[in-house]
């Protein structure tokens, strides 16, 4: 249980309704301020570098008005699992009867492990940024090993999850994606793999050129991993 006097404002903004972010469910999205990666293509720089404006207490008050109107709450960002009180907050939201989805870069495996052990989450979207040789360049971080730990945790957990990769054609090509698919296959992953197209024209952390969608012309799916494309802009 959160104590009111110690609650800061970790949430940058709130999307009150979506049918796109939790498979087959209605949801709202909580956008957490701050991130421990600086992905070159990130088009949420205001969230990554910005400060929160909404407290957990205010968010819970809002969610209580959405009981029986929404199925789920999506925790996104930024990186939602960075915040010290995220586990207690997720527990409070879960008690309201909502399904819980976590969008994460996988950098906090210990937090993810505790959430799994406490049975607080229902669905996870795990960002697979790149293979180790490109990971630091793309994310400006050295967090591949924590990501890998998170992936293995999810594989062992039985929780429904998806793996997704944002692609900018200047940073990731067909060979890179094929290596990533091979890596996922070697871990035992057999789910869907979503390739998210970079949104051209959006403000980003690093200035990048136009991203082309050449990958859509390729049949990248394997016997065990089906590749889907998101973003038709």
Show where each model-derived region lies:
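A secondary-structure boundary/capping signal
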Residues: 31, 76-77
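Short, well-ordered turn and helix-capping elements at secondary-structure junctions
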Residues: 15-18, 46, 77-79, 106, ...
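Short, flexible loop segments at the rims of nucleotide/cofactor-binding pockets, characterized by
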Residues: 49-53, 78-79, 101-102
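Auxiliary Fe-S-binding modules of radical SAM enzymes
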Residues: 1-20, 24, 171-233
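Canonical Radical SAM [4Fe-4S] cluster-binding loop centered on the CxxxCxxC motif
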Residues: 2, 17-55
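Conserved AdoMet/S-adenosylmethionine-binding subsite of the radical SAM
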Residues: 60-72, 81-210
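Generic beta-structure capping elements
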Residues: 14, 33, 45, 129-131, ...
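Flexible, glycine- and charge-enriched loops at secondary-structure boundaries
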Residues: 49-56, 140-144, 213
């Amino acid at each position: 249980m959160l104590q009111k006097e110690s609650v800061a404002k970790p949430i940058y903004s709130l999307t009150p309704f979506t049918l796109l972010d939790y498979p087959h469910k209605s949801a709202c999205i909580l956008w957490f301020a701050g991130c421990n990666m600086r992905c070159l293509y990130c088009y949420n720089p205001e969230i990554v570098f910005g400060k929160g404006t909404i407290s957990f207490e205010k968010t819970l008050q809002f969610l209580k008005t959405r009981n029986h109107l929404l199925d789920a709450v999506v925790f996104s960002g930024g990186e939602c699992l960075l915040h010290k009180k995220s586990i207690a907050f997720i527990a409070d939201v879960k008690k309201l009867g909502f399904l819980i989805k976590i969008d994460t870069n996988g950098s906090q495996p210990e937090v993810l492990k505790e959430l799994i052990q406490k049975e607080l989450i229902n669905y996870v979207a795990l960002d697979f940024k790149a293979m180790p040789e490109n990971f630091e360049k793309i994310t400006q971080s050295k967090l591949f090993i924590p990501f890998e730990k998170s992936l293995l945790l999810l594989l062992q957990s039985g929780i429904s999850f998806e793996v997704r990769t944002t692609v900018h054609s200047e940073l990731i090509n067909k060979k890179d994606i094929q290596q990533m698919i091979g890596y996922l296959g070697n871990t035992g992953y057999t789910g869907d793999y979503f390739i998210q197209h970079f949104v051209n024209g959006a403000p980003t952390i690093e200035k990048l050129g136009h991203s082309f969608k050449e990958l859509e012309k390729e049949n990248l799916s394997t016997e065990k991993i089906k590749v889907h494309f998101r973003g038709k802009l």
